[in-house]
Amino acid sequence: MASDPLELLEEPTLARVAQRIVDEAQATAGAPAALYVGDLDGRSLRRVTGDDGLPDQLESTQLIGPEIPASHAAALALAMPQGATVLPLTLRGRALSVLVFSGPPTGDVGALVARSAAALELAERYTDLLASARRHRACSAAAELQQDLMPPRIARLEGAEVACSILPAYDVGGDWIDHSAMAGGGWLGVADAVGKGPQASAISAIALGAYRATRRGGGDLADAAQSIHAAVLALELPDIFMSAVLASWDGPSSTLTWLRCGHPAPMVWHADRGLRELEGGDGPVLGLERLDPPSEAASATIAPGELVVLVSDGVLERTAPGGEPFGEDGLRLALAGMHAPSAIAAASAVLQGVATTYDGPLRDDASVVVLAPV
């Protein structure tokens, strides 16, 4: 048996790491097992390899995109076949995969589970095995690029937790979301490029590159807006632009600072006070030569129990069969249904609300980023 994650990675073909984990799990537990990953929509677990007697797919609402919050692990049992045991492979507060046993393990698999979580995350840099299993239908080139640029869906900044995801339209690819921990806090953002398909995806990728380069180079939010503006202009394509909310978080003071660039405003939710927009920091979309990017950021203290919610227009404009948009009323209903408000619960509620508003395919990517002080 492998004694550490790196030993698992010594497999000559890293596509076999998943099968090796299942083989060792079955040998240790004395029960048939299979490895599952979450799909990109966050609505089911899909079998990668293992016992054919277990289902190919298990419906579940416990995911944020393809990631499973550690806090939701116990509820995964509700999606399992009768008598089955589920063990999430958890790393840094979230699981990217789970082991499912057809019966109770008779041996101790705890050490294997801990090693396997790290090994699989490292192996993903070298094999598409897990990435392929997460897709329930083919992605366009634009949507594939979008997924490759995604940050972790669940993370911690100093003084806050972050949960985020994009419910993909699979052939659009113009949205991006991002976050990064920094000393004392971090950055987060959501953006949407005009149009659909490869052009929107290319604009989005260039803009995200400019955003990250500015952040990593020590710039501030105004610098980031200017960098995105210049990068989109440099493409020299007619009538292209990008909307965005760019924000930073200071943990010690519990302060959010933001710029709103022609995008839906950042919002704050509180169970007793409802949903409100944050005012200020406004400016035009980025990438149009006749318009200057905003330079005056706004700030607000985020109180305990409040949640910062950033969304793209794909959330607000998702329509029911009768033509009614999801809108802010849909956001309010989704957030009001949380049992215990948190970044993870809020992101999950919004994504589930958008997905269940109408059973038809998404016409636009639906993106959400939620920050909660802790």
Protein language model features and the residues they cover:
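Short regulatory/linker helices and ligand/cofactor-binding micro-motifs at input modules
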Residues: 1-24, 128, 148-150, 211-215, ...
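Helix-loop-beta substructure at the N-terminus of cytosolic sensory domains
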Residues: 1-54, 238
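Regulatory cytosolic signal-relay segments
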Residues: 115-173
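Active-site-proximal, acidic helix/loop segment immediately C-terminal to a metal-coordinating Asp/Glu
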Residues: 197-217, 282, 306-361
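A short, aliphatic-rich beta-strand micro-motif
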Residues: 72-91
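Amphipathic alpha-helical "output/dimerization" segments
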Residues: 103-121, 206-209
